[in-house]
């Protein structure tokens, strides 16, 4: 009988937006995915290098780096991660998957990763809705997002232990749930609490609609702005659990989730 490796998510940082980023009330570090020997980092914002090493998750072990859009709370440590992933630029290895805004710049946004750094990785993939790509043992599909960077994407992640969804930054819109059906876990970037409408980010009201429509096995809220932190992410998560009957947790910095 074959034993499948665990899928591990290290949610190293749970902060989002410029005010939380600049105050570091919560870290803006992103998520490390590990399965067997494969490691991929998603959205390495400010502090990603420091706190990855602090958590003993060396960026030198990365097989892939994903940047879902061109805002600094998602991209600032990407270049130093590339230098680590390429063994100090000595080995042309690893996958860099990022949006047009990150790689080339568009509509006054970006680029945020230099051509030099793009040139030293093993493979560069420009991602937009529908693009499917691999990094080690993971298969990713870029999903639709509606955000102030018009090239933003979310992710659907195929693992040895089922599918994971990561919305990245997006407002709720009709049809969003179509990308996030049949999930073991949905990770929702939820910037604002109930009663605080915002079109370009998710709030708790939008999260409720998405969870009810997508029906994942479980959800984790992350990427909190100041208003969410002041309201209490744990209270918002409990409200969503009560309303949907689906387990919903509010992430904390350094949280580890294992799926088997």
Regions found by a protein language model. Give the residues of each.
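Active-site metal-binding motif and surrounding structural segment of the metallo-beta-lactamase
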Residues: 46-97, 184-185
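Short glycine-/small-residue-rich Rossmann-like dinucleotide-binding loops
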Residues: 13, 45-46, 144, 190-192
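Cap/insert and terminal regions of metallo-dependent hydrolase folds
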Residues: 172-256
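Short helix-capping segments at alpha-helix termini
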Residues: 87-91, 113-119, 241-246
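Short histidine/acidic/glycine/proline-rich micro-motifs that form metal-
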Residues: 18, 72, 100-104, 192-194, ...
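Metallo-beta-lactamase
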Residues: 2-4, 93-152, 159-161
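Conserved beta-strand hairpin/beta-sheet module of binuclear metal-dependent hydrolase folds
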Residues: 2-55, 152-168, 185
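Active-site neighborhood of phospho(di)ester-bond hydrolases with catalytic His/Asp-centered motifs
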Residues: 41-45, 63-73, 99, 165-170, ...
């Amino acid at each position: 009988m074959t034993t499948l490796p665990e899928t591990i998510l290290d949610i190293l940082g749970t902060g989002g937006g410029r005010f939380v980023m600049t105050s570091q009330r919560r870290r803006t570090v992103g998520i490390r995915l590990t399965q067997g020997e494969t490691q991929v980092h998603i959205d390495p914002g400010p502090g990603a290098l420091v706190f990855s090493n602090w958590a003993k998750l060396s960026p030198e072990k990365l097989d892939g780096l994903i940047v879902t859009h061109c805002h600094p709370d998602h991209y600032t440590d990407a270049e130093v991660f590339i230098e680590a992933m390429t063994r100090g630029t000595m080995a042309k290895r690893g996958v860099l998957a990022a949006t047009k805004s990150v790689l080339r710049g568009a509509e006054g946004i970006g680029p945020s990763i230099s051509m030099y750094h793009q040139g030293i990785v093993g493979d560069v993939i420009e991602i937009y809705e529908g693009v499917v790509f691999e990094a080690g043992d993971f298969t990713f599909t870029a999903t639709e997002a509606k955000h102030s960077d018009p090239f933003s994407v979310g992710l659907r992640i195929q693992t040895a232990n089922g599918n994971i969804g990561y919305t990245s930054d997006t407002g709720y819109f009709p049809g969003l749930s179509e990308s996030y059906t049949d999930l073991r876990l949905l990770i929702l970037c939820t910037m604002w609490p109930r009663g605080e409408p915002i079109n370009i980010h998710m709030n708790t009201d939008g999260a409720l609609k998405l969870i009810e429509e997508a029906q994942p096995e479980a959800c984790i809220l992350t990427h909190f702005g100041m208003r969410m932190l002041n309201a209490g992410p744990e209270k918002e998560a409990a409200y969503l659990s009560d309303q949907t009957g689906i387990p919903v947790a509010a992430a904390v910095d350094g949280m580890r989730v294992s799926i088997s």
